[in-house]
């Protein structure tokens, strides 16, 4: 690591502690040349491979997950903080799995699980895109399953 002020490579760690953010360590560092201090955050990087519908593999991209959640939850009572929390919960669920290869189907089901708890409109919007309904009957099944006791 280089000093962001003078690009010198010799630094010393002054303080280390757990960060309020999940799975991160916050470190205060000091450059041995210019004596400037700065903060770094260290996180564990665990790569999750996503198996796409066409058989390709792609690295998991949290930004794609967040964009999908934002699209489904726009104009609902779900705010930006809740979108971030849902994305974080889904990522933690994925990291908790033994297998580092996850299908888009598994990710979609997790998204639907969390959206169903958070907001039914967002859940239905996501289901319409994710499940690729072929006819109105399939949509009706989701709508009926989303209502308490299948009431009409």
Curated annotation (Swiss-Prot):
Negatively regulates transcription of bacterial ribonucleotide reductase nrd genes and operons by binding to NrdR-boxes. A zinc finger (unnamed) spans 3-34. This is Transcriptional repressor NrdR. Belongs to the NrdR family. Disulfide bonds: none annotated. Its cofactor is Zn(2+). It comes from the Bacteria. One of its GO terms (molecular function) is ATP binding. Keywords: ATP-binding, DNA-binding, Metal-binding, Nucleotide-binding, Repressor, Transcription, Transcription regulation, Zinc, Zinc-finger. InterPro entries: ATP-cone_dom (IPR005144), NrdR-like_N (IPR055173), RNR_NrdR-like (IPR003796). PROSITE patterns: ATP_CONE. GO terms for biological process: negative regulation of DNA-templated transcription. Binds 1 zinc ion. Residues 48-138 form the ATP-cone domain.
